[in-house]
Amino acid sequence: MTQTLADMRRDYTRDGLTEAQSPDEPFALFHAWFADAVNTEQPPVEANAMTLATVDEEGRPHCRVLLLKGLDTQGFTFFTNYESAKGQQLAARPFAAMTFFWPTLERQVRIEGRVEKVSAQESDAYYQVRPLGSRLGAWASPQSRVIADRDELEGLIRQTEQRFADTRPHCPEHWGGYRLLPERIEFWQGRSSRLHDRLNYRLIDDRWTRERLAP
């Protein structure tokens, strides 16, 4: 018998989340949960995969999956084409939300805050450790723009390969990093009967406060 959408559900029983387990600020807890995800989740799940939501000038939301590439006490860093749709949206409205979901651990983290560009030096440092194909792709692909077909894209790649045949590609000005500076971070731990644990951290006057939310 084929399972219907209404019947698709899973009871979460792996773990709980209490205030006693949680530090006063959220970064230590995120580091701990992220380490758990790296050590537990198996392919095809990528522990650093996240959904990034942005808003355009008309107030319409857009979301897509990206990879987290930096984390420190300032915030969460990702890289992209500044001329892409998300880049234009962030230029117009520099706020975003991220969601991480780790199904094996039955955990989710939601992060919201202001977004700013990282320095050109930081962007170049990450660009230079990317695989060569990815570095060339940053030059070749007019991200988010309409192209005729796959052949056009592959032609742009060939032109870029020829351009940099005898020289190491440098980071293009239209490509680089953003850092989300969190103002809110919610940790969600799945629990039985949908009575999930939700601990919410909010940054108020440069200090983090923690509160429990009803599931």
From Swiss-Prot:
In short, the EC number is 1.4.3.5
Q: How does the cofactor attach, per the note? A: Binds 1 FMN per subunit.
Transmembrane stretches in the record are none
The protein's annotated pathway: Cofactor metabolism; pyridoxal 5'-phosphate salvage; pyridoxal 5'-phosphate from pyridoxamine 5'-phosphate: step 1/1; Cofactor metabolism; pyridoxal 5'-phosphate salvage; pyridoxal 5'-phosphate from pyridoxine 5'-phosphate: step 1/1
Residues that hold substrate according to the record: R9, R10, D11, Y12, K69, Y126, R130, S134, R194, L195, H196
Give a single Pfam family match.
PNPOx_N
Q: Which Gene Ontology molecular function entries are recorded, alphabetically?
A: FMN binding; pyridoxamine phosphate oxidase activity
Binding sites annotated in the UniProt record for FMN: R64, V65, L66, L67, L68, K69, F79, T80, K86, Q108, Q143, S144, W188, R198
What is the required cofactor set for this protein? Answer: FMN
GO terms classed as biological process: pyridoxine biosynthetic process
Q: Which Gene3D superfamilies match?
A: Electron Transport, Fmn-binding Protein, Chain A (2.30.110.10)
Keywords in alphabetical order, please. Answer: Flavoprotein, FMN, Oxidoreductase, Pyridoxine biosynthesis
Which reactions is this enzyme annotated as catalysing? pyridoxamine 5'-phosphate + O2 + H2O = pyridoxal 5'-phosphate + H2O2 + NH4(+); pyridoxine 5'-phosphate + O2 = pyridoxal 5'-phosphate + H2O2
The record's similarity note reads:
Belongs to the pyridoxamine 5'-phosphate oxidase family.
Summary of the function given for this chain in its UniProt record? Catalyzes the oxidation of either pyridoxine 5'-phosphate (PNP) or pyridoxamine 5'-phosphate (PMP) into pyridoxal 5'-phosphate (PLP).
- Assembly and interactions? Homodimer.
| The protein's name | Pyridoxine/pyridoxamine 5'-phosphate oxidase
Protein encoded by which gene: pdxH
